Amino acid sequence: MKRALQIVGLAGVLALLVPLALVSAGQAQETHVSREGGAWAQEITGSLAAVKNLRVKVDMGSVVVRGGQQPGINYVVHTHFGDSSEQDARRQFEQYKVTAYVKGDTAWIVGDWQGGRRPRRFSGEFSVVVPRDMALLKLETEGGNVDASGVAGRVEAESGGGSMKLDDIGGGANAETGGGSIDVGTVGGELNLHTGGGSIEVRHANGKVVAETGGGSVEIQSGAQGAIIETGGGSVEVRHCNGKVKVSTGGGSVDLSDIGGPAELETGGGNIHLTSAKGHVHAETGGGGIELYGVPSARAETGGGGITVKLVNTGGERNDSDLETGAGDITVYIAADVAINVRASVDMGNGHRITSDFSDIHISSEGDKWGPKSLTADGKLNGGGPTVKVHTSSGDIYFKRASH
């Protein structure tokens, strides 16, 4: 019986020590209330010991995290309440509880409104300064903006609808918002970006980029390991990206510059333009024009626009090419060292033509000037190779020598 009481007593002591350990991991908070313009402001400051990870979880307000050289974690919480008496403002401030503690290898900063329905005039901002060598930042707010920079590890950020800004991140990053924009500077790892409707911009990513928006535009200036981009209707621009690039937009334009691999490009109705790609390109639009320059092979299809393709030897894989439009002209530029077989046709040849700078491409027609006439062309260049099929229902076809 005595031993049982000793065990119960020890358990009770441990139960008391655990919450004390959590509280003692951080210093006491300091609170100051003052008048700012037409509103009351409360400032809460505190610090925590340096650990590997930081989690910030708040039900309102923006979150700003900066990496620096200091040894610990310092935080400042600013809350504001609209025009009222000081007594009323202090009563509202007391409803918003901010707790900070360390548990294991993770520091926690939590903001929780505990007063029922929150007044519309109440707002807040969490500012945190951390050591640069943090392994993980996990930041979550139900509606405010998130801004993080200057850390060597990984960042995971989530907002119910605010904007996201990430820069100088050594590891990878995930960012998700219900509708705000996402702006990314430099990230050392992979990127997963999702917004319900805002725009997405990435300046440089050393890992693969996955970017998805319900309707905003997407711009990637530099990517090192490929990209998957999807937007419900906005435009897409990629300036430089190694690896495979896959783009889908419900109706916006697609503009790619220097792609270091294959590309799959699709738009519901916008134009597609590509400056160069080292791999096979598949481009499809419901009705816009397609321009693909500096590609080894391509499949291009449009419901009604024109197609221009420049075939070159890039050192990448060369496949058969298939170029087709419902009612536009098709122009194919061919570099001097490209070996291909050519097959071309125009369904409604009256008033249209096939022309070629190459004597090895032979052009013929069927029908007469008074009836339906079709045009065809075939031949081999440099001994033949992958087949290039070119077809338009109603338009002209041109085979031209590429100058460079």
Where are these regions (language model features)?
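Intrinsically disordered, low-complexity terminal regions
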Residues: 1-404
